[in-house]
Amino acid sequence: MADLAKIEEQLSSLTLMQAAELVKMLEEKWGVSAAAPVAVAAVGAAAPAAEAVAEKTEFEVVLTAAGDKKVEVIKVVKDITGLGLIEAKKLVDEAPKPIKSNVKKAEADEIKGKLEAAGAKVELK
């Protein structure tokens, strides 16, 4: 019985991708295909894994407020977006506004850091 509990614990810790890979491996080994009963049984174990897979990979950097150093924020927005000075100023004046969309987590964090260093308030969505 202890072995079954250990197996259950290991299966519960699988990500959705790992669970799908396991299903394919077992289908090949046993010469069967996953039917509805298998999918129903896997739903309980896959629920926590679905949350892990749903983790965002693309973010939107939103300028929520320019802060006290508006000129510095405008310069950073101009550099990040490639906009002209007038367009960057308009974007900053109209905060909250998205600065950049569909960026990876690392790039979004980098942009957020630059804007916050200039005195802006920023959110990642």
From Swiss-Prot:
Keywords for the protein's UniProt record, in alphabetical order: Ribonucleoprotein, Ribosomal protein
A biological process term (GO) from this entry: translation
InterPro entries in UniProt: Ribosomal_bL12, Ribosomal_bL12_C, Ribosomal_bL12_C/ClpS-like, Ribosomal_bL12_oligo, Ribosomal_bL12_oligo_N_sf
GO annotation, cellular component aspect: cytoplasm; ribonucleoprotein complex; ribosome
GO molecular function, a single term: mRNA binding
Signal peptide region: none
Function as written in the Swiss-Prot or TrEMBL entry: Forms part of the ribosomal stalk which helps the ribosome interact with GTP-bound translation factors. Is thus essential for accurate translation.
Xref: PANTHER family: 39S RIBOSOMAL PROTEIN L12, LARGE RIBOSOMAL SUBUNIT PROTEIN BL12M
Family the entry assigns: Belongs to the bacterial ribosomal protein bL12 family.
Classification via NCBIfam families: L12
Subunit structure: Homodimer. Part of the ribosomal stalk of the 50S ribosomal subunit. Forms a multimeric L10(L12)X complex, where L10 forms an elongated spine to which 2 to 4 L12 dimers bind in a sequential fashion. Binds GTP-bound translation factors.
Protein name: Large ribosomal subunit protein bL12
Species, as recorded: Rickettsia conorii (strain ATCC VR-613 / Malish 7)
